[in-house]
UniProtKB/Swiss-Prot annotation:
PROSITE patterns named among the record's database cross-references: ABC_TRANSPORTER_1, ABC_TRANSPORTER_2, MODC, MOP
Organism whose genome encodes this protein: Photobacterium profundum (strain SS9)
Protein name: Molybdenum import ATP-binding protein ModC
Physiological role: Part of the ABC transporter complex ModABC involved in molybdenum import. Responsible for energy coupling to the transport system.
Family: Belongs to the ABC transporter superfamily. Molybdate importer (TC 3.A.1.8) family.
This protein's encoding gene: modC
Top EC class for this record: translocase
Subcellular location: Cell inner membrane
Length: 358
């Protein structure tokens, strides 16, 4: 999807120029007021930008130069709002069929089963939990067979138990539904669990975009992460299980591997691992007889000094991937680190979550 639009919204000057992939989940991330919801309202056709161009695949949705503007009902885009917006006088069945101008019983059954709402079909919205309402809203959006699904902070209005109830269904959506999803959120946890791609926006502008691993590990993202969330995301391939201990070896490249807690995936499957920057220390000499199980040879790509905190952020290259380490200014001076140096990264902890997303 190609987006190049401008719009004046009160004090916000929206100026977006970005390409979104046509597969997987793309997270739109930013603080409140950054322009996240304004962007997807433009994509859906609910609002018209002042100028620009939008295409979805080969279809042009908006072109100010040629006076093209497809209304929402002709865009084939599903939209799930923060609040479910179900019709209270319709049953779940009635809500699911509303706006669906084609009948495909198999597609209906597949969506209902995927979202686990078979037992809700004859109930009314007033009897549903917040998580159940959102599942119905997602089902309604998917039943029109959209070319793209927009989700505007679908968990924001839910309490923690309802979020935990809905999250597994969103994870299944990411795996089972062959529809690109644009997912607006300000939750780092949701990004880590769901997103394949990421666009970070601030004050109506795109700050950085790309694969979620690369954006998460970018220098632009660092100021947005709380100290406890400063980390790297790496994609690794499952290799083997340790014959004695509950550990699995995963490969980052042909000569770089990590030991992680035992996973259920088969050899050759890909998983995502997360390494906190504060769990990475550096040494110029390969350590011996150490309790740390994961030691990687790395090359320093960037050195970012934060004088106020007496801290240094080091971006390391390990094969084709990157890893961040936070060390003290004292340690950096004593090791006399500079860009291009080879060092050994000692990794105290590596996490892998239950659904391959760290």
């Amino acid at each position: 999807m190609t987006i190049n639009v401008k719009q004046k919204l009160g004090d916000l000057d929206l100026d977006m120029n970005v390409d979104l992939p046509m597969q997987g989940i793309t997270s739109i991330f930013g603080r409140s007021g950054a322009g996240k919801t304004s962007l997807i309202n433009i994509l859906s056709g609910l609002t018209r930008p002042d100028e620009g161009y939008i295409s979805l695949g080969k279809r042009v949705l908006y072109d100010s130069t040629n006076d093209v503007f497809l209304p929402p009902e002709k865009r084939r885009i599903g939209y799930v709002f923060q609040d479910a917006r179900l019709f209270p006088h319709y049953t779940v069945m009635g809500n699911l069929h509303y706006g669906c101008d084609h009948k495909d019983p198999q597609h209906f059954n597949d969506i209902v089963t995927l979202l686990g709402i078979e037992h809700l079909l004859n109930r009314y919205p007033s009897s549903l939990s917040g998580g159940e309402k959102q599942r119905v809203a997602i089902g309604r959006a998917l039943l029109i067979k959209p070319d793209m699904l927009l989700m505007d902070e679908p968990l924001a209005s839910l309490d923690l138990p309802r979020k935990q109830e809905l999250m597994p269904y969103l994870e299944m959506l990411a795996k089972e539904v062959n529809t690109p999803i644009v997912y607006v959120t300000h939750s780092l946890d949701e990004i880590l669990r769901l997103a394949d791609h990421m666009v970070m926006i601030n004050q109506g502008k795109v700050v950085v975009s790309g694969n979620v691993n690369s954006v998460w590990g970018s220098l632009e993202m660092r100021p947005w992460l709380p100290a406890k969330e400063q980390s790297s995301l790496l994609t690794a391939r499952v290799n083997l299980n340790h014959p004695k201990y509950a550990l699995t070896q995963v490969m980052l490249s042909h000569n770089a591997y990590l030991w992680v807690s035992r996973v259920n995936q088969e050899r050759g499957e890909w998983i995502r691992v997360r390494i906190h920057s504060n769990d990475v220390s550096l040494t110029r000499v390969k350590p011996e007889q150490t309790s740390i199980r994961n030691v990687l040879l790395a090359r320093i790509d960037k050195i970012h000094i934060i004088e106020d905190d007496q801290k240094v952020e080091i971006k390391l290259r390990v094969g084709e991937t990157h890893l961040w380490a936070n060390i003290t200014l004292w340690a950096a001076d004593e090791l006399a680190l500079k860009v291009g140096d080879e060092v050994y990264a000692q990794i105290k902890g590596v996490s892998v979550t239950k659904d391959d997303l760290a």
